[in-house]
Regions:
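Glycine-rich phosphate-binding loop and adjacent beta-alpha segment
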Residues: 25-97, 130-132
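Short acidic-hydrophobic, aromatic-tinged amphipathic segments that line or gate anion-handling sites
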Residues: 1, 105-109
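C-terminal capping/lid region of NAD(P)-dependent oxidoreductase domains
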Residues: 12, 90, 95-104, 112-132
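Short catalytic-loop micro-motif centered on adjacent basic/acidic residues
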Residues: 16-19, 39-43, 100-103
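Substrate-positioning beta->alpha
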Residues: 20, 109-110
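Generic hydrophobic alpha-helical segments
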Residues: 2-6, 89, 114
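Adenosine-nucleotide cofactor-binding segment
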Residues: 1-26, 78-80, 84
Length: 132
């Protein structure tokens, strides 16, 4: 359960915002890791389109759950969003203040193992493929 280290790191409070790409098996961990009055933004469904959802925990924490997609947005909207993200986060990403979690690294020859890990939804963070 990935929520446990998040709760430990925040003194049991949880985080104010989760930007989530996976869903399905991770829904309830997200709810557990989100602070009271926090927000979860669902931007992807890599783990599937359906899953368990603890409505009692959602209500008790008064969490805002926001769904977004780029499929129904125009090219101009996508460009504006990309520009805003770069302006808001670009410097911190470049300075190393923000970083994406790295789950694992595989040689390109082991791409099937990497894909199996991803399909099994066993990873937390990015899976990197390296070229020798």
């Amino acid at each position: 359960h990935w929520a446990d280290p998040v709760l430990a790191a925040t003194g049991g409070t949880g985080v104010d915002l989760i930007i989530h790409h996976i869903n399905k098996k991770k829904n309830n961990d997200n709810l557990k890791a989100t602070a009271i009055m926090g927000r979860i933004i669902n931007v992807g469904r890599l783990g599937g389109f359906n899953g368990n959802f603890d409505f009692d925990l959602h209500a008790a924490r008064r969490i805002q759950y926001i769904g977004v997609t780029f499929r129904t947005r125009s090219i101009d909207e996508i460009r504006a969003i990309t520009k805003a993200v770069q302006e808001d986060l670009g410097r911190d990403l470049g300075d190393g203040k923000l970083a994406l979690p790295i789950d694992s690294s595989f040689d390109i020859e082991d791409v099937n193992d990497a894909l199996a890990r991803m399909k099994a939804n066993e990873h937390f963070g990015k899976i990197i493929l390296t070229l020798s």
